[in-house]
């Protein structure tokens, strides 16, 4: 509605498709390209744009961390993490990709996360008509393979017919496959740390994230994370509201 009110006919168009259609579009000589998506495809876009000397803006995703230290308000953190992560079933570029939490508060955090998932999405999210599905079968299959009996903490139910995967918490390490890609789904790995410096080192061992979130009552820890990590945007004691 906004587009139809704002622009004349012919000024805006939509092309639906996959690799073939995108490849064709990138062969055109545009004045400007704004791209939102994965780093891998962003590299392709930039290379093709360079052939026409077309300027670009690349808003690329990444593994956006959510740090929870021992001083955090755990119930508040859980409420806001569940909202930010599972909005649109995790299919947003600024969703918390994984949790890095102090090992001393992990059990309490998990307990609160489980409670919030039930409160926000019901005891059976797959049957909740307001809970979204995966965008397609390919993404459904990609998410489903990360869930195993060995790493499952909570959730894990999937429904192939509806392409729904319920909000899922996983025990994880940085060596796991789920930590090697941007998740873009309702899978939330949880990794622990001993101190904030270790958490910062782990974040900086990965590519720079699009977003970063920290839940902490310690100004020292907040400043350490914000000053020593590079990221696109983020929040203290909240998630995703920086894009509002």
Tell what function each PLM region has:
Residues 22-23, 42-43, 222:
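Short, well-ordered alpha-helical microsegments
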Residues 67, 164-244:
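Conserved C-terminal structural/oligomerization subdomain of aldehyde/semialdehyde dehydrogenase
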Residues 31-32, 211:
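Short SAM/SAH-binding signature in class I
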Residues 1-20:
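PLP-dependent aminotransferase-like
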Residues 15-17, 36, 215:
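Structural motif
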Residues 26-27, 60-61, 92-94, 127-128, ...:
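Short glycine-enriched loop/turn motifs at secondary-structure junctions
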Residues 18-21, 62, 194-196:
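Short helix-initiation/N-cap motifs at beta->coil->alpha
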Residues 32, 38-174, 197, 236:
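ALDH superfamily catalytic-core signature
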